[in-house]
Each structure stands twice: as structure tokens, then as C-alpha cells.
Design a protein with these regions (language model features):
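A short, Lys/Arg-rich alpha-helix, primarily the initiator
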Residues: 1-13
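Key DNA-contacting residues within the recognition helix of helix-turn-helix
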Residues: 8, 33-34, 62
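Alpha-helical residues within the helix-turn-helix
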Residues: 12, 23, 52
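Short alpha-helical DNA-recognition segment
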Residues: 15-34
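Short, conserved catalytic or interaction motifs in soluble domains
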Residues: 37
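DNA major-groove recognition helix of helix-turn-helix/homeodomain DNA-binding modules
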Residues: 45-60
Length: 64
């Protein structure tokens, strides 16, 4: 699995911590970390929730 550097970069640019993003999308901080490091691939619904919070289309944030 590829790292999701674009997701992490977008999160940092918005000034949102992993913890805050997790709260906003209804998951745990460790899950956000695992997504950003490529250890897990988020489900389509979670991808969309993250994209909505970061105000980016999913294809700009995720490799898959």
C-alpha cells in the first residue's frame, strides 16, 4: 500500500491534527495514522468523509 502523503499534506495545510481529523470523521486517531502511512486502505465512505473535511476531491488525496 502506498503512503497517502497528499492526504497528510492537506491535513497539515488546514491546521488539523490527526486527532481532530479522526474526531471529525468518526474514527480513531490511530486509524488516520495508519491511512497516512499506507498500512490500511480506508473504505470509500471514510475516504469521502476525509475529503469532505479537507475540502478536496478524493482523487487528490488518495492513491487508490
Amino acid at each position: 500500500m502506498a503512503e497517502n502523503r497528499r492526504m497528510a499534506a492537506a491535513r497539515v495545510l488546514k491546521g488539523i491534527t490527526q486527532r481532530k481529523l479522526a474526531e471529525l470523521v468518526g474514527t480513531r486517531e490511530i486509524e488516520i495514522s495508519r491511512i497516512e502511512t499506507g498500512r490500511v486502505t480506508p473504505a470509500a465512505r471514510l475516504k469521502q468523509s476525509i475529503a469532505d473535511v479537507l475540502e478536496k476531491p478524493t482523487f487528490e488525496l488518495f492513491d487508490n
